[in-house]
Design a protein with these regions (language model features):
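As written
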Residues: 90-98
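Acidic, metal-coordinating helix/loop segments flanking the phosphotransfer/catalytic sites
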Residues: 5, 27-44, 48, 52
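Two-component/phosphorelay signaling modules centered on CheY-like receiver
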Residues: 11-29
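Hydrophobic/aromatic residues positioned on beta-strands within the core alpha/beta folds
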Residues: 77-79
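Acidic di-acidic motifs
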Residues: 8-9, 100
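Conserved phosphotransfer microenvironments
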Residues: 47-67
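C-terminal output helix
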Residues: 102-113
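His-Asp phosphorelay/catalytic-motif detector in bacterial-type signaling
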Residues: 69-75
Length: 117
C-alpha cells in the first residue's frame, strides 16, 4: 500500500485530504505542525507551503529543501493558494503544484501519477 504523508496546518484541508486519500486506498499520515512530522518512510508527500505566509521563492524553496533533507528521494506534491508556486514548480523541486481551492479528485490522481514514476 502506498504511504502518503500529508502536511497542512489547516485542520479542514488536512482532514479532507486524509479522507479523500484514504478512500482512494492510500495509507495516510497527517502532520499539522513541523513537530508532528514523523520519521517513518513514505512514498509521497503532499504538503502545503506551511511556513510561507507571504510567498517568496526563497521561503518556499527553504521549506521544500527541509523536506528533501528529512525525506531524501521522496516526491513532494505542493498544495497551495500561492499562484507563484506554480510558476516556480520546477525550480522548487516539487513534482507537482495543485492550487487551492482544488477538485478533490486531483489529489489521489496526482499521488498515483507521482508514485508510478
Amino acid at each position: 500500500m502506498t504511504r502518503v504523508l500529508v502536511i497542512d496546518d489547516d485542520i479542514g484541508t488536512a482532514e479532507l485530504m486524509r479522507v479523500v486519500l484514504g478512500d482512494a486506498g492510500f495509507d495516510v499520515t497527517v502532520a499539522m505542525t513541523t513537530r508532528d512530522i514523523p520519521t517513518q518512510k513514505f512514498d509521497c508527500i503532499v504538503s502545503d507551503l506551511m511556513s510561507v505566509q507571504v510567498y517568496t521563492y526563497e521561503d518556499a524553496r527553504d521549506w521544500l529543501l527541509r523536506l528533501a533533507d528529512r525525506f531524501p528521494g521522496i516526491p513532494v506534491i505542493v498544495v497551495t493558494a500561492h499562484l507563484e508556486a506554480r510558476r516556480d514548480q520546477a525550480a522548487l523541486g516539487a513534482r507537482r503544484v495543485i492550487m487551492k481551492p482544488f477538485d478533490v479528485d486531483l489529489i489521489p490522481a496526482a499521488v498515483r501519477e507521482t508514485t508510478a514514476r
